[in-house]
Amino acid sequence: QEPNVPQPQPQPQPEVTQKVVIGYLALDDWEFENLFPTIEWKYLTHINASFARVKADGTLNINPVRKRIESVRETAHKHNVKILISLAKNSPGEFTTAINDPKARKELIQQIIAFTKEYKLDGFDIDYEEYDNWDKNFPSLLVFARGLYLAKEKNMLMTCAVNSRWLNYGTEWEQYFDYINLMSYDRGAFTDKPVQHASYDDFVKDLKYWNEQYRAAKSKIVGGLPFYGYSWEESLQGAVDDVRGIRYSGILKHLGNEAADKDNIGKTYYNGRPTIANKCKFIKENDYAGVMIWQLFQDAHDDNYDLKLINVVGREMME
């Protein structure tokens, strides 16, 4: 008879923390109806529905999102993707006015929490980009963040989009957020000199800066990927927006499919597939939280399915 030898117990596997892939989704995008059915949900963990607009009195202008937020939430949840409402200024100066006035600030906090609950969302995202008089206004922004953090329900996610390196957020900011989305793009884009607005080197520096200077945990830091570029080409002036921005889909349309594996053609600068892949690899190899995309509707269309940047992100981050 065999002695009663205890069987070896299976050892628990080390937990693999899933990387986040946060896609901004502009609910008032002019291509929404055509492109929403083509979203690659399997490669996303979160979407930030943009934007509910902050007014000076602390109320929200929800017209840009009201019509579609519920159907988008239902689709996201069906695919096990979390959805947050992203908050930005209504018109220049209004967000700042709201956070600087204690009464409006209190109203704004209540409105954000109420909106998140009413529409059964998973949280909210603060996209404050009023950079003038930063040092004067930042203390109010910090009070606002703390107030939101204390007012929210425990299971509500609280995230933000931040400027990558040239503003001082200090070491207090990060503690209130689950994820901090670094806008590692738009560098030098608003000048007359053609320039790469989102280089790999700057991406790496931004991530390290937030970890080392602002003491944000790597598990909160999310690197931003642009699905668009800028063009200074005379021949493309009819294809760009008022700040020379052009969607990745537009770059392929006007410059040809070979653009997909480059970062610039002539005076048009963007991130092609290899750079997007390398940025994702850096995130994984260095244990940052994940990547954020601005924004999903700028990607290649399904007639160029193999050239879609989201497929590169999905392959690198999920597989």
PLM feature spans:
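Substrate-binding surface in catalytic domains of secreted glycosidases
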Residues: 25-26, 56-67, 110, 130-255
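Active-site and adjacent substrate-binding regions of carbohydrate-active enzymes
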Residues: 125-162, 273-319
